Every structure is written in structure tokens, then in C-alpha cells.
Amino acid sequence: MMTDPIADMLTRIRNAVNAKHKVVEVPASNIKKSIAQILLDEGFIDGFNVTEDGKQGIITIDLKYGPNEEKVISGIKRISKPGLRVYARANEVPKVLGGLGIAIVSTSKGLVTDKVARKEGIGGEVICYVW
């Protein structure tokens, strides 16, 4: 039994990037699809698609690298964990590396980046940092 599926997804992405893989597969869920969509919108991955396998489905993520095979995702870190939840008010939403990275925040309007949360004046649970 997996206790933290989001941390598992982030670890799979981190390991695949460090091993220079082109794609990585993770078990699907709605929150993982939202995280993948944010990573795509922010330019950290090339794309993703969801395939049905008769159970929960699989998300295949196409990883992105620079022209000389340098990593686009240099770091990805889980912040709010099942044993220690981390919440931030609208005025406390953190900036990652002075704005170079993103924080993914779970709000009442779904998963959004730190920039969107600050702009709309909403806080929530800080899921992870990506830089």
C-alpha cells in the first residue's frame, strides 16, 4: 500500500530526469493529472497522455531537456506530506528561488501555481516546489 502517491510521482520524475529518460509512467489520478498539466503549462515537461489499463490508468509523461541534454527540471521537492501538512495564507504563498521555480498549491479553485494563488489572493496547501 502506497501512503503518499504524489511523492511517488515526484520521485519517479526526479529519478527519470537524473537518469536522462525520455518518458516516465506513473499511475493515474485526478490530482496527478492536474500536477502534470501545471508542469506542462509552465514548460517543465513536453507533454503527457493518459492511457486506460482497465484499472486506474497510466499517465505517460514526456520529459523535457535543453539543446545540450541539460535538465529542465533541476529539482522537485514534496513540501506538504501526509504526516506534516503545510498550509499558506494568500499573503504567505512562497516564492521558489526568487521566482525562478514554481510552487504548486492546492486551493479551493483546484491546483494552481504560486503566481496564480498570489494574483487571485487565495491560499491553500503547498504541495511541492519545482525548479
Swiss-Prot record:
Pfam families: Ribosomal_S8 (PF00410). InterPro entries: Ribosomal_uS8, Ribosomal_uS8_CS, Ribosomal_uS8_sf. One of its GO terms (biological process) is translation. Disulfide bonds: none annotated. GO terms for cellular component: ribonucleoprotein complex; ribosome. The keyword rRNA-binding applies. Keywords: Ribonucleoprotein, Ribosomal protein, RNA-binding, rRNA-binding. GO terms for molecular function: rRNA binding; structural constituent of ribosome. It comes from the Bacteria. Part of the 30S ribosomal subunit. Contacts proteins S5 and S12. One of the primary rRNA binding proteins, it binds directly to 16S rRNA central domain where it helps coordinate assembly of the platform of the 30S subunit. PANTHER family: 40S RIBOSOMAL PROTEIN S15A. NCBIfam families: PRK00136.1. Belongs to the universal ribosomal protein uS8 family. HAMAP family: Ribosomal_uS8_B (MF_01302_B). This is Small ribosomal subunit protein uS8. It comes from Finegoldia magna (strain ATCC 29328 / DSM 20472 / WAL 2508) (Peptostreptococcus magnus).
